[in-house]
Structure formats: structure tokens, C-alpha cells
Amino acid sequence: MKKFITTAALSFMVMSASIAQTNWKLDGSHSKLGFSVTHMMVSETEGKFKVYEGTVASKTDMDFTDAKINFSADVNSINTEDEKRDGHLKSPDFFDAEKFPKISFVSKSMKPNAKLGKTAYTLTGDLTMHGVTKTVSFTAIGASQTVKDPYGNIKNGFKVFGTINRKDFGLSWNAALEAGGVAVSEAVKLDLNIELNKA
């Protein structure tokens, strides 16, 4: 009987360890969700979303293998430092913010990428934008360690980057140039700086 109880206790400890996780919340005041596109085939136009939120559940403070990530951004918060352009981006020509006010991302896997470093991962998940959901992959480079801020918050962070094709999500507006080519590139580069607070 004693052996059975000991075995059961050990099994419970192993199960508890396997389901233990560290929860994080995105710190919006110290993060940035940026993007850029090629304009007129000669320069980069940059923008960002100013309102967004997200949560992360990782195995430990530093192990984000197969972390569970949920993220959303408010399309109406788009900012390219030009009100007229921002208005056009919110219109049915692009995001159609009135009909599709949110962009969301839900992770499917997060695998270590040793070629890029000890804290590098390939992040794959479902990106939903303009009413279309596609599976996409990004590179995520984590901080080398956690830190505690002056207010007692435990922090970690990631730089996440990659490229998507806006036409895959139905954002197909463009204008042809006289010399050939188009006004706005189909490729959109994403560049996120993410700071997390341990929940």
C-alpha cells in the first residue's frame, strides 16, 4: 500500500510539472507592432498599430518552446504618420476597418532555431486579417535573460520579424506605374518589438 501511495505521489508530481507554465501579458507601453512596404519601387513606407494586446503561456521563464500565444491589434489604430494615407488604409480598398476591425494571431507551434541562437525560435500560427485566416511563420529572437524592473515586474522580450503577402489576405488594391511596376509592394515586412510582463 505504501509503495502504491509513493508511486501515485510521484506520478502526480510528474503530471503537475508537465502542465506547469509561466503566464505573460504584453506590455503595450514598451512594445511596438511595426510594418513596412515598398512604395513606388524606390523607398520604404513604415507604419505601426498603436492599440494591441496579447498573452503568452510558456514552459518556464526562459523556455518558450511551443508557447501558447494569443495576440490582437485594432485596425483603426493604424498610424503611418499621414492621416490621409491612414484613412485610405482603413477603407475597403485595404483593411476595411469598419467590417474587419481586428487583426489576430494564434500560435500553432514555436520551435527552437539553434542556427540563429540559443533564444531563437520559428513561430508558426494562424494570422487572421480582413476576414481571411492563413498559417504564417515568423522568426522570434528572445532576450538572453529575464529582468526585474524597479516595480517588481519580471520581464522578458522578443524581437519578431517576417514577411507576408497582403494579397493572400485580400488586400489587393494597387496602382500601376507608367514606367512599369506598382505603387505598393505586395510584400509586407513585419517588425515587432515585444516586451512581456510575468502575470
Language-model segments: which ranges?
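Bacterial Sec-dependent N-terminal signal peptides
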Residues: 1-23
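Low-complexity, acidic/polar, glycine-enriched regions of mature
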Residues: 20-199
